[in-house]
Amino acid sequence: MGVTFAEAFVKSQLATDVRLPTSGKIFISVRQSDKSHAIEIARSLAELGFTLYATRGTAAAMTEAGIDVIIINKVAEGRPHIVDMIKNGEISLIINTVKNQRSAIRDSYSIRHAALQARVTYYTTLAGARAACVGIINRRELQAYNLQKLHIQLKEREIAN
């Protein structure tokens, strides 16, 4: 349980054995409509010391926003590509949203498949990625809560109102 959404989300991820990295390389590739929103997530992760990798379009948006990023090929663009990095154990986290286009869906499938086999955490929505990012930032501050005490506090509030 968490008091904030981010805290609850991180605890839910940890409880289901989803790994939230504290360092390493992160791959980000998002559809055009998500690029502006992905910038804030990328900036936060870069400030935490993560090395960011992205496909050309996402990398261009990140570079324009002043974020350091390394370009990696899509699967269809040839090797070396992101699936190679995943299989080599080089990627800690993946943020990938796709447009409804056959080649994008095919690339996304191969990335998801490699990530699943390598047990790399993978987010397909910016909401999930944002919550994970906030969780990574605040992970050191996670607390255990006594449910009985919280129940008493809620009852006291009800009585007071």
PLM ranges: what are they?
Residues 1-121, 129-132, 138-161:
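ATP-dependent carboxylate/acyl-activation modules
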Residues 125:
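Extended, alpha-helix-rich binding/interface surfaces that flank or overlap catalytic cores
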